[in-house]
């Protein structure tokens, strides 16, 4: 009886599906922490596994600080720190900022800081060798490195790897920057504004346009002058200019024919007569006012 019952049980065990060997052999340490863990355990596990977990490409934007905080951050620290110096008015800085945020996400072990031009004194900028915007500084202990060359994501990743010896945890890829849209809006604002506002907002552009106009004038003025001289020699050299000479003689006789002193004296006399009439009317009104005031007082 027992043998009859064991036979179907053994058959069912043999036919049951087995787990795949890949899933059984998967190491637990390569997995990202789940939310079912306690909060403090999940936070500690995430911090420990973030460098090795390539599937967790989280966005980690750079921290905004000012110049004084930057000096405190870089003084006497051995950890690697990357600093972006940028200007909000610069279109190249607007393009560089999302790339720097991507680098912060790809290299979470490196602390990324961002300093805007207006938040740092010129002494701080000159101290860290900032000559233009955008500029990147990589500080590793007592040493500092300035990436020179292309500011594309691929070249900066190579610089990070060469300087710090760290590999990116994930490759996010270059972002698409709407340069055409930003440039078109800036051009529309520039054309809609007045000339004074355009000069205040874009002084370098105004000086460059003036320089180009002067260069064009210097380049084409000799040719233009030679053309005018040739036209004058060809068409107006043999023209009868006696009419112009007679006209100048007539204009010279006008001051002698018209006595300007008499006209000026008549104008002065007419102005004096008008002033005397005004004074007489004002004195009469004042006298009438003095006579009427006691009457008003008596009536009251």
Curated annotation (Swiss-Prot):
This protein's UniProt keywords: Membrane, Signal, Transmembrane, Transmembrane helix
InterPro entries reported in the protein's UniProt record: APRL5/7, Thioredoxin-like_sf, Thioredoxin_domain
Membrane topology: Single-pass membrane protein
GO cellular component assignments: membrane
Cellular compartment(s): Membrane
Family matches, as Pfam families: Thioredoxin
Signal peptide (from-to): 1-24
Sequence intervals crossing the membrane: 205-225
Domain Thioredoxin: 49-165
Name recorded for this polypeptide: 5'-adenylylsulfate reductase-like 6
Annotated organism of origin: Oryza sativa subsp. japonica
Lineage of the species this protein comes from: Eukaryota, Viridiplantae, Streptophyta, Embryophyta, Tracheophyta
